[in-house]
Amino acid sequence: MPSFLEPSKYCSWLSEGKLAMQAKKLEKGSSRDTITEVYRFVSTKFNYDGEKAAQLSGTRGYVPDPEETYESRKGICFDKASLMCAMLRSLGIPAKLVVGTIDGVSHAWVSAFDGDKWMKCDPTMGGWQDESEYVERYEL
């Protein structure tokens, strides 16, 4: 599980940066409550960037920058999932950045460990979605 706690190419943050400081403000008594707070924050405070999605459509190799997403307050699904993942990991909560499809469309979401089980969180779609719609390709 250590790899789901560490910064990575797709889920990085500055330990003294604004993203980590904001995550600390959202921390609650339990991992589950903290996951819920971070999820709510990312899903409600960050807009979906349709223009960016159109520009990146059909391209490969995009690497999200959670710190940039935090500053701009917008991003595509990969950005929002990467941001949520980075915020949770900065608090010591294991989190996976998951890439796959939902209803046949490329998508990214988060799977976070609450101490008992992995919780699927989709900060782009704004809900705890029906798991049957998600097809996981890989975790980062």
Regions found by a protein language model. Give the residues of each.
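Beta-strand-enriched, solvent-exposed domains that form extended recognition/catalytic surfaces
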Residues: M1-F4
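Secondary-structure boundary elements
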Residues: S8-G75, L83-C85, F113
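Hydrophobic/aromatic-rich core segments of domains that either
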Residues: D79-L140
